[in-house]
Curated annotation (Swiss-Prot):
Catalytic activity: sulfate(out) + ATP + H2O = sulfate(in) + ADP + phosphate + H(+); thiosulfate(out) + ATP + H2O = thiosulfate(in) + ADP + phosphate + H(+)
Segments forming domain ABC transporter: 3-237
UniProt GO MF annotations: ABC-type sulfate transporter activity; ABC-type thiosulfate transporter activity; ATP binding; ATP hydrolysis activity
Gene Ontology CC: one annotated term: ATP-binding cassette (ABC) transporter complex
Compartment(s): Cell inner membrane
Residues that hold ATP according to the record: 35-42
Name assigned to this protein: Sulfate/thiosulfate import ATP-binding protein CysA
Keywords for this protein: ATP-binding, Cell inner membrane, Cell membrane, Membrane, Nucleotide-binding, Sulfate transport, Translocase, Transport
Origin species: Pectobacterium atrosepticum (strain SCRI 1043 / ATCC BAA-672) (Erwinia carotovora subsp. atroseptica)
Length: 330
């Protein structure tokens, strides 16, 4: 099921949440709406679902204009950040709920519902928890059950609003990998909202970067990271450093891993003072002070990098951005 979003505008009082949003989502694609709080990503997701009405513009599902259809007629599955499971129902009953609530003339038989629930519980790898209650599950298990409940009605589109936001970091990583594999298995057009750059980069086929109600860039994870369309995109997708080029108004941007260090003076390198050294597993992060520049430079190097040998706070070391070979002295 493809999605076409055409000229969508939405305003709340004096606040313009969405400004002329245009986006095409291909059938079977997994797309991330990524951006800071207040950028409009959740509002856009709710408009796609039919939970919110735009002030102007159209939502097209597979060639059909559904702009005037409410959420019940759009056949979308929606997964919220906070699970929204019924506490008084078992896992089995929570998953079965959507089918049991269908009108009698289109409701599957009891045996068909049971079969479908078992299929979905197997799909989310929790078939052994059917008789448990939500309070007996971990956060990650609850979110999988919420996803199974959304999928059991066979939606044409799956929408997820920060589905892993309420989980701890380790569980989020595990569920990201699982969701990516699940999407490959079911091949369902899916859109998810996140403010987590790593989550979007790891899971999505394409990323839609949003800021202040507009789309800054659309592309694959590699495209938006390696070829950012704006300074906002560059900074939002990871840690970055900024330097002014000597005797010009040019500013260069580079990431912490795009730094070369040397204990010996070399052409193109500048002396910097080490302000902080932080081991981060396989990497070591350094904060470096260059001349009179107020912003510290962040550098990341392998923990066995020769430049780290015996290095301490307050030492002077040589530094340059790897990507720039011209004279950028300050």
């Amino acid at each position: 099921m493809s999605i076409e979003i055409r000229n969508i505008n939405k305003q709340f009082g004096q606040f313009r949440a969405l400004n002329e949003i245009n986006l095409s989502i291909h059938s079977g694609e997994l797309v991330a709406l990524l951006g800071p709080s207040g950028c409009g990503k959740t509002t856009l997701l709710r408009i796609i679902a039919g939970l919110e009405q735009p002030d102007s513009g159209s939502i097209i599902f597979h060639g059909q204009d559904v702009s005037v259809h409410d959420v019940r007629k759009r056949n979308v599955g929606f997964v919220f950040q906070h699970y929204a499971l019924f506490r008084h129902m078992t896992v089995f009953d929570n998953v079965a709920f959507g089918l049991r609530m269908k009108p009698k003339n289109i409701r599957p038989s009891k045996s068909d519902i049971e079969k479908k629930v078992h299929e979905l519980l197997n799909l989310v790898q929790l078939d052994w928890l059917g008789d448990r209650y939500p309070e007996q599950l971990s956060g990650g298990q609850r979110q999988r059950i919420a996803l199974a409940r959304a999928l059991i009605v066979e939606p044409s589109i799956l929408l997820l609003d920060e589905p892993f936001g309420a989980l701890d970091a380790k569980v989020r990583k595990e569920l990201r990998r699982w969701l990516s594999q699940l999407h490959e298995d079911i091949d369902l057009t899916s859109v998810f909202v996140t403010h987590d750059q790593e989550e979007a980069m790891e899971v999505a086929d394409r990323i839609v970067l949003m800021n202040k109600g507009v789309i800054e860039q659309i592309g694959t994870p590699a495209e938006v990271y390696n070829h950012p369309a704006s300074e906002f995109v560059y900074h939002f997708l990871g840690d970055s450093n900024r330097l002014k080029v000597a005797q010009t108004e040019e500013t260069i941007l580079f990431r912490p891993h795009e730094v070369s260090l040397s204990v010996q003076a070399q052409d193109g390198y500048q002396a910097v003072t080490v302000r902080d050294i932080r081991p981060l597993g396989a990497l070591t992060r350094l904060s470096l002070k260059l001349g009179e520049q107020s912003e510290l430079i962040e550098a990341e190097v392998a923990k066995d990098d020769v430049s780290l040998e015996g290095l301490q706070k307050g030492d002077v070391i040589q530094f340059k951005p790897k990507r720039y070979n011209h004279d950028w002295e300050i």
